[in-house]
Amino acid sequence: MKMMKGQVVLNMPAEKAWEMYRNNEIISKINPELLSRADYIQGDGAPGSLRLFKLGPGVSNYVKESMEKIEKVVSGRSVTYEVIGGDLKEMYDPYRVTFSFVPTQGNSNKCIAEWKAEFEPSAPATPPPEQARDAALRFLESFDNFQLSY
């Protein structure tokens, strides 16, 4: 299985970033250019829940939507999804993503937001999901600006 990851430092406590990420109403307002809507189709965010992400115009040339099944939740810290439908599922099988929010040592008002993907390309010519990584990191960076209005 191949892996790719990236991270950004956020100027907020990990708990706040976690709450923003897990709340469909809030996450849909953070950066509609990248993520226009999120809904739990089944469940409430626990393992086994299905969450549908509708992507915004900033990434719709690459991915329009992604249906994800929550596999693992470490409360307040990380959530792991397996993509079970949408454009990414056609390019990679499996495609598993983990979003983590980790407090920085010595400063409880900052955290490290990490995106990690584990994947297998569906075809030999399929490139690594660099566009997905870049979009996810841009989205995570948007948390800082949004929190000022939240």
Where do the protein language model's features map onto the residues?
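Residue-level preference for beta-strand/loop junctions
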Residues: K2, P47, Y62, D93, ...
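Structural signal for hydrophobic/aromatic residues that build the beta-strand cores
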Residues: A17, R51, I70, Y81, ...
